[in-house]
Amino acid sequence: MGRINYMAFTIPENLHPDLMPLAWLVGSWRGKGRGEYPNVPGFQFAQEVSFNHDGRPFLNYFSRSWIIDENNEIIRPAASEVGFWRVKENNVLEVILAHNTGIAEGWVGIVSGAKIQLAMDQGYSSPSAKIVTAGSRLYGLVEGELFTSYDMAAEGQTLQAHLWSSLERQG
């Protein structure tokens, strides 16, 4: 049998039942975004994100990005993050992330259809990393594209918009 088609995405047959609320995320995504923050010039970035599974009740998550110029040419590597996403009772989502910048975070939120809202629950910064005190993330599937936004409070700033992107499913 193999795979079951569901709406605009395919559900792998061996996806753990707990992960069905996240089935629309499974796979690879690629696109572009923009970023800004106080004392940081605005920038554009290219991004690749993947959500994979091995039959257990969590998704493996990997994201990497590159700063790009106005011609979409890569200037340099930027942020990378890895983590695990798991759905608990009542579509509560728990996410653990680690960043190449020396930050690790725990996030808690809700999956509601093709929309995810997360709030940072706990954070850790290595001695040389910036201090992030709060964050919120939004993920949503709109007309087949994955839209993301990340609001951050860091280095004494209040919670405010930092990153947003639009990604297309690959393959």
Where does each model-flagged region fall?
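Short connector loops at helix/strand junctions that flank enzyme active sites
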Residues: 44-46, 54-58, 78-82, 88-92, ...
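Amphipathic/hydrophobic helical signal segments and adjacent flexible N-terminal regions
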Residues: 2-58, 66-74, 143, 154-171
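Hydrophobic/aromatic beta-strand elements that line small-molecule binding cavities or substrate pockets
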Residues: 46-52, 81-86, 106-110, 134-140, ...
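Acidic, glycine-rich flexible loop segments
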Residues: 101-104, 111-136
